[in-house]
Amino acid sequence: MAKNRRDRNSWGGFSEKTYEWSSEEEEPVKKAGPVQVLVVKDDHSFELDETALNRILLSEAVRDKEVVAVSVAGAFRKGKSFLMDFMLRYMYNQESVDWVGDHNEPLTGFSWRGGSERETTGIQIWSEIFLINKPDGKKVAVLLMDTQGTFDSQSTLRDSATVFALSTMISSIQVYNLSQNVQEDDLQHLQLFTEYGRLAMEETFLKPFQSLIFLVRDWSFPYEFSYGSDGGSKFLEKRLKVSGNQHEELQNVRKHIHSCFTKISCFLLPHPGLKVATNPNFDGKLKEIDDEFIKNLKILIPWLLSPESLDIKEINGNKITCRGLVEYFKAYIKIYQGEELPHPKSMLQATAEANNLAAVATAKDTYNKKMEEICGGDKPFLAPNDLQTKHLELKEESVKLFRGVKKMGGEEFSRRYLQQLETEIDELYIQYIKHNDSKNIFHAARTPATLFVVIFITYVIAGVTGFIGLDIIASLCNMIMGLTLITLCTWAYIRYSGEYRELGAVIDQVAAALWDQGSTNEALYKLYSAAATHRHLYHQAFPAPKSESTEQSEKKKM
């Protein structure tokens, strides 16, 4: 349903506006304003307000229009919302030469204020989508998006990375709001956040993101690089230049940024003045802002938002409508709500982890080398008790080595890496036990000896049971004997050829299970006892051939 009415806008003027709703029921007309669509909860989880998102982006007037999403992101308390409100003034009054407004008019729109505490949380979008005609005549929908500042005292690194990455993934124009300069840590944070966003997206041969604009606020060196886009372009070219004399780490940061965005530019903006910075009651009136700032602001905003500057949102080369943007918003937030992505770490945590892992690797390598000297490939078989004693000595030595290395993170942080070291050493010890046992001739002969014993026992039992008329049992024993004989031949072939190793391992496991039913002596004792007890039955079942003289003597007796 659509309604027309004259509303007083945020800057005191009247304008004719059309409000659209997808709902069938009539809703009261609401004044345009910021709407929270991404909420960061107290437990640092994320929630998307789909109802609000649908209400704004799926209205009949805009849902099938190709969308231009403009976002401002960066550190907290650096004037992002303040800048967004000047963007709103331009969007509402862009046909006017003096779009910046009256000098006594307070600045309203997205919530902002002076001070040191954060104002915006999550992601907010302006409830009114602006329909703009591009130079080619195509009408596009322009969405303005304000984001939570990074690195405030209440947000984790994951919170900051998620909000920044999500806004970069959704936007077609991402303004990276910086203060005074582009420092190396700014580039490293950008690398981290964009990589966190790229992880959540499908693999593509195209650059994953579109336009990145470095907006350097409070620029203090106009004598080196002039205010505006020309000075910014020269400044950024110098900052992002990759040269052979740079450290590899610095080169990688710059290459990564270039690989992520199709277009990168920069604008240098002067300081708004001392009154803005120090007046606790500053409400955005132009009369309190320095003229140099206003002059460059009048250049910046049209440079960002004029029809010819607007970049339509594209994903994998396909232009996205407002309807499609809603679906991508939902899909991306599901990824960040889950645990598929690794949690980003602070530089201290990442360094401490690398430091501890290096100590684990060194201690483990020391254990490995000394165990090789004791029971390596060319060393003879070592008694199991002696091997265990050496293992315990070397394990203690490796633990001392780990504890002696200077590590970042403290004792508590290192404790789990110590446990990891002990676990890995115990796993290595198990491998050394198996390797040492393979050198034992009795251990190596365990499988054929076990199979031979099975063959012999079943042969004897088959003979005895066949003699006393238990043909079924005799046949069963003969079958087992035949299968065991085939298994023995198969095992011998596997050991000789090296083929079908998995089958050989199964045969060894079965033989080991039979072996473990009793010691070798017990098995032999039982075997000999059975043979001695039933020897006469065996001879009766399988009589030896008689000589001719014996047969003749028996005939005479008869």
Swiss-Prot record:
**Entries under Gene3D superfamilies matching the protein:** AHSP, P-loop containing nucleotide triphosphate hydrolases
GO cellular component assignments: axon; endoplasmic reticulum; endoplasmic reticulum membrane; endoplasmic reticulum tubular network; endoplasmic reticulum tubular network membrane; Golgi apparatus; Golgi cis cisterna membrane; Golgi membrane
Q: Which residue windows are coiled coil?
A: 418-439
Q: Where does the record place the region 3HB (three-helix bundle) domain?
A: 347-438
Write out the ranges of the annotated region (Autoinhibitory domain): 521-558
- Tell me how this protein sits in the membrane: Multi-pass membrane protein
Q: What is known of its domains?
A: The N-terminal hypervariable region (HVR) regulates ATL1-mediated membrane tethering by organizing ATL1 into a lattice structure on the same membrane. It does not affect GTP hydrolysis or membrane fusion. It has no effect on the GTP hydrolysis and fusion steps.
Q: PANTHER family from the xrefs?
A: GUANYLATE BINDING PROTEIN (PTHR10751)
Protein's recorded name:
Atlastin-1
